[in-house]
Amino acid sequence: MIREIQIAIYLTIFRLLFNLFRVFPIQKKATFIMSYGENALSIYEEMREKKIDLDVVFLYKPTCKYKLKDYPEVKSYQFETLSIVNMIEAVYHLTTSKYVIIDNYFGFLSAIKFKEGTECIQLWHAAGSIKKFGLLDPNFNKRSKRDQKRFKRVYNNFH
């Protein structure tokens, strides 16, 4: 119960910031949200090689095992920390990006609706594995109705 309250507070703050930043225009920008990094960095390397004209932002969780300082041309921010400043910067970049590229499930997607013109793309982070995920995960039905509803809102954000 306490965890659900914490999640609800976090998502409310996230939604408020996101809606506040909606006044800013969408920019030619790709924001990568990385919990792992492998696939996202491969895509970034390909974009750089093909000279795709987009600003790039990395939002990374502490679980990301790559040294993003090796990419000084990219703005990088730690994501989902207790830092209010990092949260504000992260939400701003998400709100103003033309492309949002994620490598995992992120609950904040249940609280927002991207502006028309923004594409949210989910990368599969476990190439070659065979497992059930998303709504087919056997544990899905064991979750609370509130959790199930939030998961469905997240999955509705993908194109």
Model-derived segments and their meaning:
Residues 48-51, 92-96, 109-120:
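Glycosyltransferases and closely related glycan-assembly transferases
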